[in-house]
Amino acid sequence: MAGLEAIKYGRGRLEVLDQLRLPHEFVYDNVSTCEEAFDSIKSMRVRGAPAIAIVAALALAVELHHEKDGSKTKQEAVQYINKRLDYLLGSRPTAVDLSNAIKLLKRVSQSAAEATNALDDSAACADVRKGYIDAAEKILEDDLTTNLAIGRYGAEYLRRQQMPIGGEEDDEDPSKFFTTSPPCTQGAPDRTYRKLSVLTHCNTGSLATSGHGTALGIIRSLHKMNYLDHAYCTETRPYNQGSRLTAFELVYEKIPSTLITDSMAGALFARMKESKNISAVIVGADRVARNGDTANKIGTYSLAVLAKAHNIKFIVAAPTTSIDLETVSGADIKIEDRAPTELTQISGAVVGKDGHVDVNTTARVAIAHQGIDVWNPSFDVTPSMYIDAVITEKGEVVRSSKGTFDFKTIMPERWAQQVEGKELSAETNVKAHVDDGTQFPMENI
């Protein structure tokens, strides 16, 4: 998506878009240390599970590129990397992408130290740094590829829900059978099918990833493939990622869209499901447990219950890095609580009497009594019984008739290693399998 990037990176330099200033200002912060990355993540200037992991990984890569570790031996270099990664983990404990990236990068660094043939300590340290930097940059590169695949699989999954298996299913261009013109009955003699409308929550697009997005990536793909009628997005209180960021991305891409408050979803489904063919709620995930329970932005659980009540598909879009096979269920997921002021106060650009938005003047105002007690969890956990499918870069995993999700089908090696406790096969050991399915040669691991 040209012109809209949350992360700008070149070896030795990292810039992160300050998303708290959107949609009115484009300001990139230079991030040259792990402390600056930690602050960007904690303050939510950067957010979204994939983007958080990428920024954390690349911030340390920038430090290492400039040799800020000051290591004298390869062992010191590994110790420095591990210490800095442990520090970064505390910036957003709920996001499994961050913990997965940290585990990978620790393995990479240790393996680089063991594999180096350098004859002096300085060169050995350089090999460890290079091993880390290469792996961190690969995380950035792979994320975009992953998101494009999620978008494609998700769009095709939803298309199949609209178009029964039949002659046109095998047509080279199924989009020509989709229309927004009612009345239009599936399977009608003219072989036309309703374009679908969807609802999304929070922000899961280019601003939350390296590009394209996960849940919003599916919406982008639906639009590009001519299957989409309309996209609805929630404001996503209390941080308003939907109104500030998702609405901004949808308008930027000229995708037909409407913003609603979080509490309007039930009314939207009741009044407009049939007329707009609202077919799915699509959300992202900060962590998916082994049984399919999903931690995501607060308000996701409510939407899932409403979707089930209205017989609307509830779809989770997430890379396999967000699937945590070591966490058995949502009961084991740590939920982050945030500051009470996020509910009781709000900031924004000042609107003049003429309706003009003055981006150079911001104000913070109180919207609740400052003495009220506040409970402000950043995430909730949606039980797997409310989720119809999890869309990943390897395809969809659909809830079975028994109410279970079989992630083993898309991650057999990880399942064997982390769930069954089996050793990877000799063939798999030739290439080490990282959490997102990307394979690195063993010498780089």
Curated annotation (Swiss-Prot):
How would you classify this enzyme at the top EC level?
A: isomerase
Annotated active site residues, numbered on this chain, are: D286
For this protein, the record's Pfam families field holds: IF-2B (PF01008)
What's in the keyword line of the UniProt record? Amino-acid biosynthesis, Cytoplasm, Isomerase, Methionine biosynthesis, Nucleus
Instruction: List membrane-spanning regions.
Output: none
Q: In which pathway does it act?
A: Amino-acid biosynthesis; L-methionine biosynthesis via salvage pathway; L-methionine from S-methyl-5-thio-alpha-D-ribose 1-phosphate: step 1/6
The protein here is known as: Methylthioribose-1-phosphate isomerase
Q: Which reaction does it catalyse?
A: 5-(methylsulfanyl)-alpha-D-ribose 1-phosphate = 5-(methylsulfanyl)-D-ribulose 1-phosphate
- Cellular localisation: Cytoplasm; Nucleus
The entry assigns this protein to a family as follows: Belongs to the eIF-2B alpha/beta/delta subunits family. MtnA subfamily.
Q: What is its main location?
A: cytoplasm
Q: Where is this site: Transition state stabilizer?
A: C202
**Record-linked SUPFAM superfamilies:** NagB/RpiA/CoA transferase-like (SSF100950)
Report one GO cellular component: nucleus
What organism is this sequence from? Sclerotinia sclerotiorum (strain ATCC 18683 / 1980 / Ss-1) (White mold)
What does the record give under GO molecular function?
A: S-methyl-5-thioribose-1-phosphate isomerase activity
Q: Which domain of life is it from?
A: Eukaryota
Keyword check for Methyltransferase, yes or no. Answer: no
GO-annotated biological processes: L-methionine salvage from methylthioadenosine
| The protein's role, per its UniProt record | Catalyzes the interconversion of methylthioribose-1-phosphate (MTR-1-P) into methylthioribulose-1-phosphate (MTRu-1-P).
Record-listed E.C. numbers: 5.3.1.23
